[in-house]
């Protein structure tokens, strides 16, 4: 289930023009913001902007001050949703160096998303270079507190101005960054899950495997329903009542024989955190499977003791144990074990440089 591929070769690097922000935060202002950063509310001083056009390819790469984008009201993204994005973090290690985790996998996933949304495929080298270019000017924004990081958000959208259903001839690729703190204050806590049976996240042959905004927009109403039911997150089923994923995280079941099973389907986003967690589990000798898991197998497995642990995983939370599954006519307490949190600790230790990276997952962004 590895998502990592060999990088493309033979590409000359982009030559970024750098326009410095003349109104950057002072060291004192930035330090205050980094004390307890909230997810996605504070942004660094600069951003990446790269253009693409039919015939012109990728061109005019720039590092520029963070600020509003000028869009024509007829920009295709506003009408037809031709948009994709990624999420990846930069970590400050104890020696002050700045690293990221499996950026080649994120770059490949962005390419798959682009293919599905009829957008141009950004070379993985350019993807990684764009992260390095932003860190070169905004590296001071990478926090050093426990479980803190700089969340990097690459995204791409159709910006050609026209009305008509066709792939756009002009596209923009951007990267912005936001310092973030620990997802769970005081350590990872079990989350409660609402079973959505009225709504679907994605359909067969649809865009479920792409990281595109429409999938997340479709999850907002059922997520609101989950909140109304007193739950933290929502889990979706496919048309055959097989478990798919949460609104923004993959799900993993741990069976009493030590096997880890994760739902596998063309309509599920291939999670890089999930792939890494499963690799670490396999390194420990656990059997790992990707297959369909019905909601009945989940509930009956918990009731019989065959399933001994259930957890969700993703870039933001890393790993979140699932403590409760709630439906319209049931509330199932979920068994809590030690494996999820043990794997979470191992993964974050690798990301922050506290444990040896035997898989070559870390890539340095500074220096």
Predicted segments with their positions:
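Helix-start/capping segments and mature chain N-termini
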Residues: 2-137, 149, 155, 162-367
